[in-house]
Amino acid sequence: MHSWKKKLVVSQLALACTLAITSQANATTYDTWTYYDNPTTALDWNNMDAAGTVDGNYVNYSGFVYYNNANGDFDQTFNGDTVNGTISTYYLNHDYNDATSNELNISNSVIHGSITSMLPIGYYDRFDTLDHDGYSEYYRFNNGTDTVDGNWYDGDVFTLNIANSTIDDDYEAFYFTDSYKDGDVTKYTNETFDVSEGVAVNLDVESNINISNNSRVAGIALSQGNTYNNTYTTESHNWDNNINVFDSTVTSGSDYILDSAYTTDTGTFGTGHFGNSDEPSDYTGAGDVALSFTDDNGASDYAMKNNVYFSNSTLMGDVKFTSNWNANFDADGDDTNGDGVPDTNHGWADDGLNVDELNLTLDNGSKWVGQATYTVDTTSRMYDVETNSLTPGATLEDNAWNRIVGNEVFQSGVFNVTLNNGSEWDTVGDSTVDTLAVNNGSQVNVSNSDLTSDTIDLTNGSSLNIGEGGYVDTDHLTIDSYSTVGLTESTGWSTYSNLYANTITVTNGGVLDVNVGQFDTEVFSTDKLELTSGNTADHNGNVVSGVFNIHSSDYVLNADLVNDRTWDTTQANYGYGTIAMNSDGHLTINGNGDINNGDELDNSSVDNVVAATGNYKVRIDNATGAGSVADYKGNELIYVNDVNTDATFSAANKADLGAYTYQAKQEGNTVVLEQMELTDYANMALSIPSANTNIWNLEQDTVGTRLTNARHGLADNGGAWVSYFGGNFNGDNGTINYDQDVNGIMVGVDTKVDGNNAKWIVGAAAGFAKGDLSDRTGQVDQDSQSAYIYSSARFANNIFVDGNLSYSHFNNDLSANMSDGTYVDGNTSSDAWGFGLKLGYDLKLGDAGYVTPYGSVSGLFQSGDDYQLSNDMKVDGQSYDSMRYELGVDAGYTFTYSEDQALTPYFKLAYVYDDSNNDADVNGDSIDNGVEGSAVRVGLGTQFSFTKNFSAYTDANYLGGGDVDQDWSANVGVKYTW
């Protein structure tokens, strides 16, 4: 029986095992409990007949395991068998012979019932419902012989191997019918003999239990049994238990009969649902035990060491640990020298030998759902032993003052839990352990339950998730190496903090994630939040810091914010902690007060208490296209409620907020948002009108080249022409910045008209171009279509006037990435009207050369539509006007090879002034996106006439010095003259 089901009275009945069980060589079904019925007399439970009695009425047990099975029960191997009832290894375990194997192997079998190392027991009045005498009535069974040796031998460990088998604790009672004569009438009584053990495996011997290959065991209880050995004197020993579970499941068992509804007459606790009764393995919540470890042997001098390992397995149920002082340990202390002051706790010199242990490890994706509980003896009167645990309460002075002096204690037992490699623990009820280590992507989920541990350590991407109704208490919480502790609105805190720790350390990429509402202070409580980073030497010179993330919370930290890091990169302790938040978040750091319960509001020069110390980066996590400058610029992010703070804060990143990027900036004991440059998407949106103008300017140059070439070389009577144009631009007006590539084609047709005072060329052209606009992550794909009418008048005195009118339509598809990685896109279109006018004089140099001074003016007037990007940035439709003024000179020479062939190279030099003073309205703010300034144009070109009617031409230009530099442009075309 478990320690939680105390026996009140013991009645022994030695029964001979008279029913022989056949060989276990073949798969067989066995029943360990049977009933011998005398049909003439009724069963008298209080005076049950002895086994083998002629004409008796008795329950018979045949389930003992022996090393050398000569008694007709079981040997040490079950393979493919089914057993109904209780298997007892009592005689196997107590045969202390070095030559015998203390091992039981169960494979490919089903045990409907339990295994025990004790003598089997059965209750006929477990709940005292028959005679109400205050006792539970039961019988204990043996084989009528004594054990070989009553001593305990340390190291003679019982090994139980369970492979591909089920032990379901589902034989909780032996049901039988007793018949008897009442006169000449045969009557029947239905009897229940309660043989439930509470779990499937119940052992009070040192044990190694190996469970593997998809096995299922409904609970294990290990207790420290007899440790007496008359040959042991002063040497130390340990009682060692090991449980290893691979690819299998351990569930809770059952203390009571479940296959009938509860009645006060029988004391059964089963329930029914659609015709099915509860099963022992049905975990119903806190109190339903799957693993139990009990050292309540008050006569033992030896500690009980329990190691439990689960790999790729499931544990469904509570884990219970009970520990008491060894018999040779004095918790109050002993005065050995008679001076009236205790000086020793006795026990073993090695403190570890005085302490029971339960070490539970979940590995390789194992999962545990259940409660961890322990009952241990504690003392704070430590004379020659060292602290091995902390109390969630307090230790007091051992005097009349009775003041709180700490939390350190010495316990009779410690319970440690470790999760490795993606394992999981979902806590239930009120769990208490000494240490909790969560490693390598594992997780602990605490909802509608409590978890208390002296220390909690999370490493390598692990997580502690505190959900609704979850509470976690610890002395020291360490969040290390990209692990996370999460607290959200759904946590549901009220009067008490859902997370309490005297110290919280966040480092090496760990995250304390607090995503709550406004003006919150109670979601977690701590005296000290250590937000720091690992040594750069351990991270190849990089800083990997811990993160305190408050999202959009308006959070008040009533704790000291500390680290020992400096901003000085030359120092060995260079590093920082990171405070992360959204732009609408706010952190107030109040500190936790000084030793006299003062606070950091004392700003005098003698105040030695600071609310924050160390070096920190402030990271803005959110990004949005919405909001004006007034919504962000100068907003307070952090307020340290202590002007004497020596903490340093600097920007960890830039965040895209509205049209601009912002970063954190320290101003005294506050940190505010500092406005920086345009965001990538805003930069692209504001650069589009200028980029449209660049395309149009290239088209202007293309039309101008056509008209210039008509005045030089062989005679030109008008014709048809086609020209490629392209170029690269770099724009920078101090606000916008971009790089642009353009490629396009123009086709035109014109004719020569002789006027009274001038010779005219009149024509029309169409242009098609694509542009690629970019800067950092910003990208714009441009399409334009243009229509031109143009003319040129050349007078007899060699003065000429060129002019054109144009209509253009521009389509622009914008995309970019925001600072948080979010993809942004949008599109806009605009219509534009333009003109060009050029006045010049062709000065002839002999028959073939010329120099042409000229002046020109051109203008483009765009009208765009209102549009909004996918991140909610709004751009009002902009009327964007651009004027260009140019003074220059062309010079060339025509080499004539025949009357049909000629080559005319030429050179161009000009001064250009762009006047484009424009502002755009973005999110309600006016932003300068005009480009202007003086520039110099340098160009080279040539025209070659292959025949009288067919010629080709090319030129290249550079223009630089203004807000927009044209790194290069090219114009390559052919024409056919009439």
From Swiss-Prot:
Domain Autotransporter: 713-978
Alphabetized UniProt keyword annotations: Signal
Signal peptide bounds: 1-27
Annotated Gene Ontology cellular component terms: outer membrane
One Pfam family in the UniProt entry: Autotransporter
Gene3D superfamilies, A to Z: 2.160.20.20, Autotransporter beta-domain
SMART domains: Autotransporter (SM00869)
Stored PANTHER family: C-TERMINAL REGION OF AIDA-LIKE PROTEIN, PTHR35037:SF2
Protein name: Uncharacterized protein YaiT
Gene: yaiT
